[in-house]
From Swiss-Prot:
SUPFAM superfamilies: Homeodomain-like. It holds the Pfam family Myb_DNA-binding. Disruption phenotype: Radially symmetric flowers. Loss of functional stamens in dorsal positions. Organs reduction with five organs per whorl rather than six. Involved in the dorsovental asymmetry of flowers. Promotes dorsal identity. Keywords: Developmental protein, Nucleus, Transcription, Transcription regulation. GO terms for cellular component: nucleus. Specifically expressed in the dorsal region of developing flowers. Residues 6-61 form the SANT domain. It is found in: Nucleus. It comes from the Eukaryota. This is Transcription factor RADIALIS. Its main location: nucleus.
Amino acid sequence: MASTRGSGRPWSAKENKAFERALAVYDKDTPDRWANVARAVEGRTPEEVKKHYEILVEDIKYIESGKVPFPNYRTTGGNMKTDEKRFRNLKIR
């Protein structure tokens, strides 16, 4: 999924993956961190990767604060009573 929040052109999935990998290599104590990350994400400037990181951190804080609801996923494990009800209502012709 491409990200468009912030400014500039959207980030592609390939760019986001390169960005994630670069962050794993160049931690906060790395000299010239954003220049190194930008080199790993072809076509992005140090300013762009730093802004992308700041947006990511902001999003994580927002999620962790509970302001973003968890999606309501259907369970795949199955519930015996629910499954039995489904099978009872199933008519094979």
